[in-house]
Amino acid sequence: MHNSSVAAVIAAISLACANAPAATAAEVLITQAEATLPAPADLGALGTRGLTRGPRVEQISPDPRGTGAKSPFPLAIKFVAHNDTTVVLDSVKVTYLKSPSVDLTPRLKSHITANGIDLGDAQVPPGTHMIRVDVRDSQGRIGTGIVKLSVLP
């Protein structure tokens, strides 16, 4: 191939790569700086039982019974309302349990629906991360769930 032909091929490849759609980046759920914060002193004292039956919070993905997930991973949390009620979207609060605690709600706002939280690619540093999810139903009953994320290096 002549130098001008090689240059033309390289230019064509460069142009094709420049116009190719970029891979979507994972959304940062927890930063490395947040992950290094100390655990709260009262982590063992988290109460989640109430007298009435508020919405239930279930971790779907990553599998809470699994051995861990590599980041980025799909994060799916399901809300289950009871007795013909619905989850009040503005009541959902997601907190990373550290000292001080970190409000993750603004990062997840666009992924929260009445059925739960669905984040396609959550970027989380390796380690074990505890997240509290608080929800309220249309009758004012509160439900709380603890989501444990085990992230592999």
How should each PLM-predicted stretch be described?
Residues 82-93:
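Solvent-exposed loop/turn segments flanking beta-strands in beta-repeat/beta-sandwich domains
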Residues 148-153:
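Short beta-strand edge segments in extracellular beta-sheet folds
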Residues 110-118:
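Aromatic sugar-binding surface patches on proteins
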Residues 23-73:
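Short, compositionally biased P/S/T/A/G/V-rich stretches that sit at domain boundaries
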Residues 74-83:
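Short edge beta-strand/loop segments characteristic of extracellular beta-sandwich folds
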Residues 121-128:
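Surface-exposed, short loops/turns at beta-strand junctions within beta-sandwich domains
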